């Protein structure tokens, strides 16, 4: 989220991740939205709270890669596929689909960022981690029946699969095998938007939400309505 501004010390972005099972959060202040910075933050998140099965994302350019080369699959997507994490992009222009993290972002603003004065960016980074620890241990959620995130993890005896503490960001000069999902709403023009590329879809899909799945191993784009495969497109990746 961001940018936000620290008086006398410039702007920053907050990299916020929430686990939908426990509502554990991971937050980290960053100076930029550059993809390598986000990838490094993701690595630290996965070392702390574990690797997810799915990573739900909005359609921010930093997450998907390049407008000029939409089939090159950017660093964040390659990193997810490398660790067998399935990225899922929400519909374009529908931020409420990320409701859980949007609710936390509101909490971050009201109970952290706007409640105190930060002397500097480094001070904010330290205080962000204090807020992360406090939230996970003490923030009670009605959807968790009044429990805190750490209560849920403890009671479930949950042991996440985490990256080793010394794991480095891998060199990702190829697109790993895996799947990338995009949820899209089809309007009357029958256009399916995949990272800026336009595909024409069958008329019967008008005014429906569909799931488009890029299967990188076979260079194919599969289109599903509910769980039924309704169309397939050749989708040759670049940068392999």
PLM regions and their residue ranges:
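Short, acidic, Ser/Thr-enriched surface-loop or helix-capping motifs
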Residues: 19-20, 224
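RNase H-like DDE/DDD metal-dependent nuclease/strand-transfer catalytic core used by mobile genetic elements
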Residues: 1-14, 20-125, 129, 133-136, ...
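C-terminal, beta-rich DNA-binding module of retroviral/retroelements integrases
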Residues: 136-240
């Amino acid at each position: 989220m961001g940018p936000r501004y620290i008086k006398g010390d410039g702007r920053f972005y907050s990299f916020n991740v929430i686990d939908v099972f426990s509502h554990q959060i991971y937050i980290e202040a960053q100076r930029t939205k550059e993809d390598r910075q986000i990838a490094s933050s993701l690595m630290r998140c996965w070392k702390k709270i574990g690797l997810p099965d799915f990573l739900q994302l909005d359609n921010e350019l930093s997450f998907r890669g390049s407008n000029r080369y939409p089939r090159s699959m950017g660093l964040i997507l390659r990193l997810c596929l490398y660790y067998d994490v399935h990225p899922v992009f929400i519909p374009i222009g529908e931020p409420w689909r990320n409701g859980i993290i949007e609710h936390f972002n509101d909490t971050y603003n009201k109970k952290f960022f706007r409640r105190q004065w930060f002397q500097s960016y480094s001070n904010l980074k330290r205080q962000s981690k204090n807020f992360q620890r406090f939230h996970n241990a003490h923030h009670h959620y009605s959807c968790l029946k009044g429990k805190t995130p750490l209560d849920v993890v403890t009671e479930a005896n949950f042991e996440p699969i985490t990256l080793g503490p010394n794991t480095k960001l891998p060199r990702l000069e190829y697109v790993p095998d895996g799947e990338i999902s995009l949820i899209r709403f089809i309007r009357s023009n029958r256009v399916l938007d995949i990272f800026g590329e336009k595909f024409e879809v069958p008329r019967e899909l008008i005014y429906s939400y569909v799931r488009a799945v890029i299967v990188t191993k076979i260079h194919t784009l599969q289109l599903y309505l509910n769980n039924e495969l309704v169309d397939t497109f050749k989708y040759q990746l670049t940068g392999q």
